[in-house]
Amino acid sequence: MALSREEVAARYGAALFGYAQDNKVLDNVYDEMMELKKAVIATPQVISVLSDPILNSKDKKDFLTAIEKNFSEEVQGFLNLLLEYDRFAYLVDIIDQFAVLYDDKNKIASGTATTAVKLDDDQLKRLGDGFAKKYNLNTVRLENKVDPSILGGVILQVKDRVIDGSVKNKLKKIRAQIIDEN
């Protein structure tokens, strides 16, 4: 029975994570995999070529060798493993799964700060730092989403937590109180 995309990503992501952690190169491998992901997203033809069933193994290996020369032995070995087992089509999913494991280990979370106006980097950092401190995390990376309909304040969504400090929500609560009192 064939594995689903999620199962392949989970297995290979966990294998890479375990290998990098055991060899004490986790941070370096993480950095390289994030760079690789950016490059592959910018140039999706790389995955197309390396997962093309028509191309022979030698041509794929030659192509991969040209790409991987800037990476560590660990990442090179992993990329060769993906090529050998014909898993290159799953590369971005594998990297994403690896990143989830890395973030969990390092108490890093990502989320969204929805505001009525755009926040600058310093404001986002302070919001993230405050959330991280409150929820015992090392780092919270926030992306700013602008939604003028919330009127003001901020809605923070990080992992499974939502903190709605928007003016719209506060007005809604006040309205509900007034209606309940009458």
Curated annotation (Swiss-Prot):
Record Pfam families: OSCP (PF00213)
A cellular component term, taken from the record's GO annotations: proton-transporting ATP synthase complex
Membrane topology, from the record: Peripheral membrane protein
UniProt cross-references to InterPro entries, sorted A to Z: ATP_synth_OSCP/delta_N_sf (IPR026015), ATPase_OSCP/dsu (IPR000711)
Location(s), subcellular: Cell membrane
Principal location: membrane
Superkingdom assignment: Bacteria
Binding partners and assembly: F-type ATPases have 2 components, F(1) - the catalytic core - and F(0) - the membrane proton channel. F(1) has five subunits: alpha(3), beta(3), gamma(1), delta(1), epsilon(1). F(0) has three main subunits: a(1), b(2) and c(10-14). The alpha and beta chains form an alternating ring which encloses part of the gamma chain. F(1) is attached to F(0) by a central stalk formed by the gamma and epsilon chains, while a peripheral stalk is formed by the delta and b chains.
Main function: F(1)F(0) ATP synthase produces ATP from ADP in the presence of a proton or sodium gradient. F-type ATPases consist of two structural domains, F(1) containing the extramembraneous catalytic core and F(0) containing the membrane proton channel, linked together by a central stalk and a peripheral stalk. During catalysis, ATP synthesis in the catalytic domain of F(1) is coupled via a rotary mechanism of the central stalk subunits to proton translocation.
Family assignment from sequence similarity: Belongs to the ATPase delta chain family.
Name recorded for this polypeptide: ATP synthase subunit delta
Originating organism: Lactobacillus helveticus (strain DPC 4571)
Gene name of the record: atpH
